[in-house]
Amino acid sequence: VHHFYHSVDRRKLIWMLAHKIKDKKYLKLTWEILQTCEQGLAIGFFICQWLANFYLESLDRYITTLDGVKYSVRYMDDIVLFGPNKKKLHRARKAIAEYLQKRLRLQMKGNWQVFPLKVRPLDYVGYRFYRDYTTMRRKNFLRFTRQCRKVRKKIERHQRIAYRTASGLLSRIGQLKHCDSVMARKKYVDPIGVRILKEVVRNESKRRQCAGKCVLAGGAA
């Protein structure tokens, strides 16, 4: 969806909420939150993530009725359709574009594509999905390997590993669990050891908790 967050019609959103939720105080508070942004939904507000998904809820139901769409996946405003017939997928794409414009007052991005998975993988949510295996997106994998080399050098030189570095690498390692990555783990993760990274994060968490208790105790005194 083109500029999704900024293009959400707030009055229509409140109208849609009012059909589901009868609590006037909640609706009023939600409207006041929406008013803090010049237009659409504010990126970063926790409630706006939920509201964005709610706004496209009817589209999800509509897609299930389209001929030729066997499966569909949506992550926020990124939508993927799967089907055996190319012409039917093109018709489904046109129907979705019309629905977005007429019912939700949104515009579909012009970079949509229709292609067979036999020819190329699906690049989606940080991964590359092939027919029978999944890999991490190339640029994400390169960042991961650089982080591993950086941490490995620090360990070999007995240097301190920063909390941000450890937590960031743990996040990348977590991504590996969702793709075919046995060789990558053996080559890059095993020489480092996840235990060392977790220990850095755990020690920093304890330090922050202790600092918070000290501030609270000082304020109470």
Model-derived regions, located:
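Secondary-structure transition/hinge residues
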Residues: 64-67, 104, 152, 156
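Right-hand nucleic-acid polymerase module
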Residues: 36, 90-94, 108-221
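Short aromatic/hydrophobic-glycine micro-motifs
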Residues: 68-69, 105-106, 127
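A common structural junction motif
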Residues: 21, 97-106
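Conserved polymerase palm-domain catalytic core
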Residues: 1-76, 80-96, 115-121
